[in-house]
Amino acid sequence: MMTLRDLINKLLGRETSSANTARERLQLVLAHDRVDMSSLTTDLLDKMRKEILDVVAKYVEIDFEEVAVSLETEDRMTALVANLPIKRTISGEIKFKKTDKANKDIKK
């Protein structure tokens, strides 16, 4: 894919710099990565969800009715987001810290 800058450089007889070549290669890699994300089928996501839940369930009791696993894309980055409400640890009560907006630790 030739950019306008590449076309002007070619018409003026300038050689392509290694920076331009590297930039073009990086753009191809990024485009390839984006295409690969589209290959995540519903079946594959379901398998990933099941495996994640199986691993987490070894250590904590999960509220399976409230579990949500999704793919979210923002600014060319795709993230697998898993919201797993935890009832308690397998050995007993769950212990955790919450941090409020003023960065003060609140223990529950």
UniProtKB/Swiss-Prot annotation:
Functional note: Prevents the cell division inhibition by proteins MinC and MinD at internal division sites while permitting inhibition at polar sites. This ensures cell division at the proper site by restricting the formation of a division septum at the midpoint of the long axis of the cell.
Family to which the UniProt record says this protein belongs: Belongs to the MinE family.
One GO-annotated biological process of the protein: cell division
Protein name as catalogued: Cell division topological specificity factor
InterPro entries: MinE, MinE_sf
The keyword Cell inner membrane belongs to this UniProt entry's keyword annotation: no
Top-rank taxon, per record: Bacteria
Cell cycle in keyword set: yes
Keywords assigned: Cell cycle, Cell division
